[in-house]
Amino acid sequence: MDALQLANSAFAVDMFKQLCEKEPVGNVLFSPICLSTSLSLAQVGAKGDTANEIGQVLHFENVKDVPFGFQTVTSDVNKLSSFYSLKLIKRLYVDKSLNLSTEFISSTKRPYAKELETVDFKDKLEETKGQINNSIKDLTDGHFENILADNSVSNQTKILVVNAAYFVGKWMKKFPESETKECPFRVNKTDTKPVQMMNIEATFCMGNIDSIDCKIIELPFQNKHLSMFILLPKDVEDESTGLEKIEKQLNSEALAQWTNPSTMANAKVKLSIPKFKVEKIIDPKASLENLGLKRIFSEDTSDFSGMSETKGVALSNVIHKVCLEITEDGGDSIEVPGARILQHKDELNADHPFVYIIRHNKTRNIIFFGKFCSP
């Protein structure tokens, strides 16, 4: 198991739990790999306690060469855009008054080829804001307009992280559109909301996780480079969304165990999942501070001397916007005769809240992490 992948998973789980605390009954969605990449780039320019703090929060203790690790992951993940409607934008914008050191520029050039940009917040704020908004809009094929709200930057901004991630999935097996029906989605024990429910009968990898009374299923996207794992409680058992048990027991070891192929077996499954689109703009600053990332945001305590000789430089803001669309779309559903080994039919009906991850199977990195609680 790759040390960077373990580190990224641990950070993904920490961050997910933080966001769940903030949104106990709402939908949660973020892109851990985008956040990790941007913060790891900031770490290259940080020194002393600031660098150590980033390393601790991102669980880099056992990772030998962080920038090289991200270079490999980024180049692997970037190849996916030729198969999928997937865009992962991770930018670190630095004000030009910082006069970045040549050493910092050269050490980040290869591992973070497109991630670092020098801009002018100080003297040309409105123009710079417009440029960033337009560039993110272009890079996401027009999906994200005006990613920077009026108050997100000022002429005092020194370093800004902007993440924008969107994915419109195409399944390995297409859901027949004629089978999509409006059904009640149970947001808790007593209330329901209507949702368009997609249905298919096919062979999938599925398992039971008894410790959390849950089913898990792997749904591969076309070409199997990415998979969506759904963790679905057997029922809504608590007084909230039914996800309390999962959220409580979730840690990176548990997640690795739950998504391990040995937990699951091929089975013929009658599957029902909601058709949905979730768009979230999150402000991860408070969550990151709760996880121990405190110095980086304060001009009095942050140390970015590996990047610039300017004193009092801090990370001003982290903008993180994600959009995920799950539809019927996919390849032709052809059942392989050999896959009919298990004849008994399992059922997975996601008509109540569930946790999901979208994982890059080659590097096992989590691209998206979310919970779906309400249509």
Curated annotation (Swiss-Prot):
Determine if Iron-sulfur is one of this entry's keywords.
Answer: no
Highest taxon of source:
Eukaryota
Query: Which positions are glycosylated?
Result: N99, N133, N155, N188, N361
**Sorted alphabetically, which keywords does the UniProt record give?**
Glycoprotein, Secreted
Q: Where is this site: Reactive bond homolog?
A: R340, I341
Report the subcellular localization: Secreted, Extracellular space
Q: Name one GO molecular function term.
A: serine-type endopeptidase inhibitor activity
How is this protein annotated for GO cellular component?
extracellular space
According to its UniProt entry, the function of this protein is described as: Tumor suppressor. It blocks the growth, invasion, and metastatic properties of mammary tumors. As it does not undergo the S (stressed) to R (relaxed) conformational transition characteristic of active serpins, it exhibits no serine protease inhibitory activity.
What protein family does this chain belong to?
Belongs to the serpin family. Ov-serpin subfamily.
Complex and partners: Interacts with IRF6.
Q: What is this protein called?
A: Serpin B5
Q: Which organism is it from?
A: Plecturocebus moloch (Dusky titi monkey)
